């Protein structure tokens, strides 16, 4: 069936629908950064530092001080898709900076599964790294500063699909053999 079989308004709607669908199909979606990517493609610490990461959701935090109150200067807002770069790499964690010269924020794997993502984390009193979403009181410790999370304790890292694709393409690929014709 061709477009000529449709009346003019329906023909225009069909063409617009086709154009919209084709436009949607070309947009790259930046995926969560899964453990499987790092493991399966043997992504090195140096390569991790070249990837563009983003935060998956909005974060709202208040700096905690002895006064107990919150001033506007103590409110920290990090918007969804704020870009960041890896500064340090551990076996199951990454430290990602979202500001120039910033010390970075910890993200730790949620589990040992291949589908685990790197979620917001913090150092605990005993020096271990805990997921902020697992804490009874969601407080993020950054050096000497402490921040109570009002929103976003469950955020995780997403990665630029384009950058990740470049790393994957840099791996050896088998070209295959063709028979003589």
Label every PLM stretch briefly.
Residues 75-120:
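Mid-length scaffold segments of soluble, non-membrane domains
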Residues 54-67:
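Generic short beta-strand segments
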Residues 30-54:
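Post-signal peptide N-terminal segment of mature Sec-exported envelope proteins
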Residues 20-23:
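C-terminal motif of bacterial Sec signal peptides marking the signal peptidase cleavage site
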Residues 124-181:
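C-terminal partner/receptor-binding element of secreted or periplasmic proteins
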Residues 25-28:
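Bacterial signal peptide processing site
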Residues 39, 64-82:
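N-terminal post-signal-peptidase region of extra-cytosolic proteins
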Residues 2-13:
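Bacterial N-terminal signal peptides that target proteins for export
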């Amino acid at each position: 069936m061709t477009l000529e079989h449709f009346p003019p308004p329906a023909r225009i709607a069909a063409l617009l629908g086709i154009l919209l669908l084709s436009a949607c199909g070309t947009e790259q979606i930046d995926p969560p950064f899964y453990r499987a990517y790092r493991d399966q493609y043997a992504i090195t610490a140096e390569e991790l530092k070249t990837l563009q990461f983003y935060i998956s959701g909005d974060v709202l935090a208040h700096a905690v001080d002895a006064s107990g109150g919150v001033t506007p200067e103590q409110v920290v807002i990090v918007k969804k898709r704020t870009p960041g770069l890896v500064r340090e790499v551990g076996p199951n964690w990454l430290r990602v900076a979202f500001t120039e010269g910033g010390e970075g924020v910890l993200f730790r794997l949620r589990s040992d599964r291949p589908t685990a993502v790197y979620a917001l984390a913090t150092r605990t009193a005993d020096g271990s790294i805990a997921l902020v979403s697992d804490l009874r009181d969601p407080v993020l410790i950054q050096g000497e500063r402490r921040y109570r999370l009002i929103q976003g304790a469950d955020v995780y890292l997403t990665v630029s699909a384009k950058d990740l694709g470049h790393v994957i393409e840099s791996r050896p690929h088998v070209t295959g053999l063709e028979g003589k014709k």
